Amino acid sequence: MAQRYPLESLLSVRHYREEEAARAMARAQSALKAARVAEAAKEKALIEWRKWREEEVERRYEALLGRSVPLKRIFEFNQGLSELNAQELDLAAALEKARCEVRRCEGEAARATAAASLARKNAAKIETHRSIWQQDAKREAERQEDLEFEEFKAPRKE
């Protein structure tokens, strides 16, 4: 009869921790991927907005050049340019925030990967111990069988 491994419950806990660490690593990788996509989208939006802003400023200057314009209109023009600059700063701040989120997610992913590696190593240690224990248990069972066989030898006929 095969004996039950005495550390079986510890082994199952280690496997559970290993699986949980793998799931946490997958979640961290997914969050990192999403953060990188968001960063790329914000960077693209900023680049496109800057291109549009240059065209818009040029269009606004063309509308003013060669005409007599009241001072109020020039003030409104300058105010409009300031608003465009403020919008650019908002987009640049959003991009920087997205980059910070990517760095944070990279750190989380690195920690999750390290935790998963540690969990795998811990489970492997118990697996190795179980393998050694099974070999020892098998040898002990064979030794017990040999002892029983020696005790059971038939008496000699003389």
Regions found by a protein language model. Give the residues of each.
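Charge-rich amphipathic alpha-helical interaction elements
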Residues: M1-E158
